[in-house]
């Protein structure tokens, strides 16, 4: 019997095997791919797709990887089959014009039989039906009987990147779980018996636009071995979920739910498997920089988190539970993927926030559904009428409240209702049409023209690292997105030059300003953007005529450039100081380098304290005063990382990178412009520290001349305040504090007066109370009473009435409605809750609200509808109390 290797051992054994055969071991690429055509890394070969398509030269002739992958196209099957996942690891070996079929087949067979110890008699292989070479290699070189080599069609065993381009046949190795059935009944479609574990793709052909296949000049190998699948086989467990890669996560979730996995019913086991699978996907997605949102990969992440929470709820877990689950996932993954522990705080913060928000969504959605059930029941003519939630209502729950359709169906079924799925889909299609119409209004002419021009223009040569002025030739002109031969004075224009000293906006640094000049010509440049390899200068012709083909002198505004350089270098120093003083694991999450300020976003789950900010500011100014000289070098990416250069997380870098090094202080990968010496910055001042998103903080600061401008503006404000308060600058804090105390006392006194007035008015309302059964109901309007005074009056009136219900409304100011409901214990025992009741009444005034079962407040913005809303409240209360 083969050895029961751990998942980690399988991964390392695979990589070591191919490393010993001349393959370069590369780390997993990010789940956020470079390929703009896909949202997520869905296959082991995706990071190498540009090489396979001939768009990039390989750094190594053969490589091997363990690649993180996420696919959600079969998300509904997760947990229901033995091997469907959203997150999985694909082990692969790749050849770029080096070895081909013979070696790939021989090594794959050696690995699975001799290294992993799978019995040859339990393995079956498949080949493309026309690939005689692969068939012969398996039969003659490897020695597999012909009847255990299955010929398959193009749909199963032929790979292509698209309708045209590189393609080729595949060959797969399958494991046989039921060899006792014999070789007479080999059907690779029977996934209860056969499990595909290794896929070999032989890229040897190129398909042209007419569908003709021609041999490739360079033949490539692309393989994939599913780690979870091989772990299932080697560990002798019935499915991928019970391997050591996932099962500890499942056990953690089961423990929280108070379940024993082996004794759980099938539906409970499915929910536990979903949680185990999704936890891994969520962890790696957030670690790779994806944050929950309503678009693109952010929506994929949000959906996965919500499915985790929903399945936890199906297991009876009513409270937040995902943090201990994700901690188990981190423990399992951190040895192979250290970044999951490094980004633990971000992962847990985002997950906890999303979980808590969705639990509120679930609670709100369930309340709304119960109201819908009541409304449908009351509108049914007789018992034969269908108990169905309309597609429009189900879509509103989904679109407005984020309530999943499948959860609407599930709860509806529990209450004997169905959901109009066809109507839901019609509403969804209406939304798609609205989205398409919105997208069609976007003007894409400029980008389209640039894309067309790029086919005829060479890349712009950038001279700005060493030159502030340079001669260039106008290669293209665009006006309102259209290519033109010339532009006259007064017109706005986009200019493409063959060479330029102007820096184009990139890496957070804004583009240069300056001029283009020539014989009788002056063009003011206000911005520079990079479109592919072209630098596009945005400006206006102030004098003369600018023509395509004209030679011009390009001159940047040196004062603006120096300000940008000071702020860019200061940003590097700021990041270095943050890492030293606050947390070495801090990573950049975004930046702005402008002429008048800098903004730096970074990963941190808490605010930076005032003491830390002062230390950071002092350290940066110390480095400035120490006059550290910049060292700029171009080097291989691997060498830069080995030297400790800081890279922006999620940024895509080429094989060669530019490194900005202030030795002993800061070393970063950066394509921006910088000072030659930190002393050129002059001074650095932090002006704000704020939060911009969960787990993301922001520091705004100024450097160089901008510090003086900031201080002058602050002094002006202080002088104005001193004059207004008739106090010296140093006396302002004390004077403001005294005024705040006086204002607070006056407001408190005024509120007390208002409350007393409301109580006096309320006394006169007692006579309006009506008896309903053994209870009393009082619904009334109380003038312009404030919300706080209205609440006091409601509590007072209920106390006077004894058992009953009080609903009061007022118009505290123009355009606003205040409502309050106070219910006694006897009313609550009948099933009426003040919070939900007053929330529904508030909707009639264009608002909402809620609160506790005994006391709740709400508001609206349509005072003209207050009387009507109070009448509805009166009628509903009386009807509800009579019927119960």
Swiss-Prot record:
EC number(s) reported in the record: 6.1.1.7
CDD domains (alphabetical): AlaRS_core (cd00673)
GO cellular component: cytosol
Keywords: Aminoacyl-tRNA synthetase, ATP-binding, Cytoplasm, Ligase, Metal-binding, Nucleotide-binding, Protein biosynthesis, RNA-binding, tRNA-binding, Zinc
Predominant place of localization: cytoplasm
Signal peptide extent: none
Catalyzed reaction equations: tRNA(Ala) + L-alanine + ATP = L-alanyl-tRNA(Ala) + AMP + diphosphate
Protein task: Catalyzes the attachment of alanine to tRNA(Ala) in a two-step reaction: alanine is first activated by ATP to form Ala-AMP and then transferred to the acceptor end of tRNA(Ala). Also edits incorrectly charged Ser-tRNA(Ala) and Gly-tRNA(Ala) via its editing domain.
UniProt-recorded name of the protein: Alanine--tRNA ligase
Gene name of this polypeptide: alaS
């Amino acid at each position: 019997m083969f050895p029961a290797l751990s998942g980690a051992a399988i991964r390392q054994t695979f990589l070591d095997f191919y490393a010993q055969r001349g393959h370069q071991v590369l780390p997993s690429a990010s789940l956020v791919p470079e390929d703009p055509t896909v949202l997520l890394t869905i296959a082991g070969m995706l990071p190498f797709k540009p090489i396979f398509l001939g768009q990039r030269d390989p750094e190594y002739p053969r490589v091997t990887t363990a690649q993180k992958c996420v696919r959600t196209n079969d998300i509904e099957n997760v947990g229901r089959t033995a091997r469907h996942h959203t997150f999985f690891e694909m082990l692969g070996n790749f050849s770029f014009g080096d070895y081909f079929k013979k070696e790939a087949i021989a090594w794959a067979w050696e690995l699975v039989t001799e290294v992993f110890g799978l019995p040859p008699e339990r393995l079956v292989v498949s080949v493309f039906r026309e690939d005689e070479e692969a068939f012969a290699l398996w039969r003659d070189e490897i020695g597999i009987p012909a009847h255990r080599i299955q010929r398959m069609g193009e749909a199963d065993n032929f790979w292509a990147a698209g309708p045209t381009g590189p393609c080729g046949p595949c060959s797969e190795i399958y494991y046989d779980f039921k060899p006792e059935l014999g070789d007479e009944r080999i059907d690779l479609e029977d996934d209860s018996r056969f499990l595909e574990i290794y896929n070999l793709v032989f890229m040897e052909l190129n398909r042209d636009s007419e569908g003709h296949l021609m041999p490739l000049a360079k033949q490539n190998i692309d393989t994939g071995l599913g780690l979870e699948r091989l772990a299932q086989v080697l560990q002798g467990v019935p499915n991928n979920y019970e391997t050591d890669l996932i099962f500890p996560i499942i056990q953690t979730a089961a423990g929280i739910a108070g379940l024993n996995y082996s004794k759980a019913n099938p539906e409970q086991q499915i929910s536990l498997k979903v949680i185990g699978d999704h936890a891994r996907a969520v962890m790696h997605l957030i670690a790779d920089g994806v944050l929950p949102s309503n678009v693109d990969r952010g929506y994929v992440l949000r959906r996965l988190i919500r499915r985790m929470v929903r399945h936890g709820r199906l297991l009876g877990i009513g409270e937040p539970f995902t943090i201990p689950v994700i901690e188990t996932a981190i423990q399992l993954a951190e040895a192979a993927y250290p970044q999951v522990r490094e980004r633990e705080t971000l992962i847990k913060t985002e997950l906890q926030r999303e979980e808590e928000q969705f639990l509120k969504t679930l609670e709100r959605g369930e309340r709304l559904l119960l109201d819908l059930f009541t409304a449908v029941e009351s509108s049914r003519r007789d018992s034969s009428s269908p108990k169905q939630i309309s597609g429009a209502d189900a879509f509103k729950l989904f679109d407005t409240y984020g309530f999943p359709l499948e959860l609407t169906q599930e709860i509806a079924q529990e209450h004997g209702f169905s959901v109009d799925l066809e109507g839901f889909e019609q509403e969804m299609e209406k939304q798609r049409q609205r989205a398409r119409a919105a997208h069609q209004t976007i003007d894409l002419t400029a980008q389209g023209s640039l894309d067309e021009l790029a086919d005829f223009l060479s890349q712009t040569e950038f001279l700005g690292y060493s030159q502030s002025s340079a001669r260039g030739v106008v290669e293209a002109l665009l006006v309102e997105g259209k290519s033109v031969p010339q532009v006259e004075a007064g017109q706005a224009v986009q200019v493409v030059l063959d060479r330029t000293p102007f820096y184009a906006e990139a890496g957070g640094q804004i583009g240069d300003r300056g001029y283009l000049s020539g014989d009788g010509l002056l063009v003011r440049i206000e911005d520079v953007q990079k479109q592919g390899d072209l630098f596009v200068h945005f400006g206006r012709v102030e004098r003369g005529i600018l023509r395509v083909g004209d030679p011009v002198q390009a001159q940047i505004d040196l004062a603006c450039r120096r300000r940008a350089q000071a702020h860019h270098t200061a940003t590097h120093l700021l990041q270095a100081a943050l890492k030293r003083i606050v947390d070495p694991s801090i990573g950049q999450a975004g930046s702005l380098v402008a002429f008048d300020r800098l903004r730096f976003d970074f990963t941190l789950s808490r605010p930076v304290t005032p003491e830390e900010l002062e230390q950071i500011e002092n350290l940066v100014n110390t480095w400035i005063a120490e006059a550290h000289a910049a060292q700029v070098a171009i080097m291989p990416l691997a060498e830069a990382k080995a030297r400790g250069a800081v890279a922006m997380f999620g940024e895509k870098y080429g094989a060669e990178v530019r490194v900005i090094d202030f030795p002993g202080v800061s070393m970063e990968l950066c394509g921006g412009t910088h000072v030659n010496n930190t002393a050129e910055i002059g001074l650095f001042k932090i002006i704000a520290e704020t939060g911009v998103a969960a787990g993301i903080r922001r520091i705004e600061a100024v450097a160089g001349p901008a510090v003086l401008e900031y201080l002058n503006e602050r002094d002006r404000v202080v002088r104005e305040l001193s004059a207004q308060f008739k106090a010296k600058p140093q006396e302002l804090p004390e004077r403001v504090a005294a005024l705040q105390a006086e204002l607070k006392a006056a407001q408190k006194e005024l509120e007390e007066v208002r409350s007393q007035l409301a109580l006096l008015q309320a006394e006169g309302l007692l006579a309006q109370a009506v008896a309903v059964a053994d209870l009393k109901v009082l619904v009334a309007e109380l003038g312009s009473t404030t919300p706080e005074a209205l609440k006091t009056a409601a509590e007072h009136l209920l106390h006077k009435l004894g058992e009953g219900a009080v609903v009061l409304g007022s118009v505290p100011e123009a355009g606003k409605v205040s409502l309050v409901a106070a219910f006694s214990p006897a009313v609550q025992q009948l099933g009426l809750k003040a919070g939900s009741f007053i929330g529904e009444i508030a909707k009639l005034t264009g608002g909402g609200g809620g609160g506790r079962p005994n006391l709740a407040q709400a508001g609206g913005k349509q005072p003209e509808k207050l009387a009507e809303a109070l009448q509805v409240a009166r009628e509903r209360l009386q009807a509800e109390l009579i019927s119960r």
